[in-house]
Amino acid sequence: MKIEIKEVIDKREKEKVSKEVLYDLPEWFGLPESTKNYIIDSQDKPLLACYVNDEVAGYIVLNATSKDCADIFVMGVKKKFHRMGIGLKLNNAFEILAKKLGYTYSQVKTVKTGCYKEYDITNKFYIAMGYKELECFPTLWDEWNPSQIYIKYLGE
């Protein structure tokens, strides 16, 4: 099995990768308007895609929230590639890119643990990647989806 991480530059290819992954994950990305926004907004940001035997397996997008902090804007791994280390590889590549671009911190927002089993899996993943809970905003998105913010120090 050949696993490869590549930075995608072309906007049409970014759109294709985003659609292919997010449409495979309706349990996480089931709100059409939000999913559409992730697909459109990802086109102007650094995007890393993971390919398994030349098939898109997952992707991660970097968004700058400040001069010091890179945000995981969106990340997804197709279901058939879950539990194969794809998320770990994408996260590691994201951190390398963030440090190369001068960021010393990374943050990610997700739905707080205890709300939905799918997001409990997501929270466990980020904790396993070394992220720490920073703060929860109960109504940032809406009252049914409290926004948990995680942060990680990447180094100087």
Where are these regions (language model features)?
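Flexible loop residues that form catalytic
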Residues: 65, 111, 139
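Conserved acetyl-CoA-binding loop-helix of GNAT-fold acetyltransferases
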Residues: 83-100
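Acetyl-CoA-dependent GNAT
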Residues: 3, 7-73, 78, 91, ...
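Conserved GNAT acetyl-CoA-binding A-motif
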Residues: 98-117
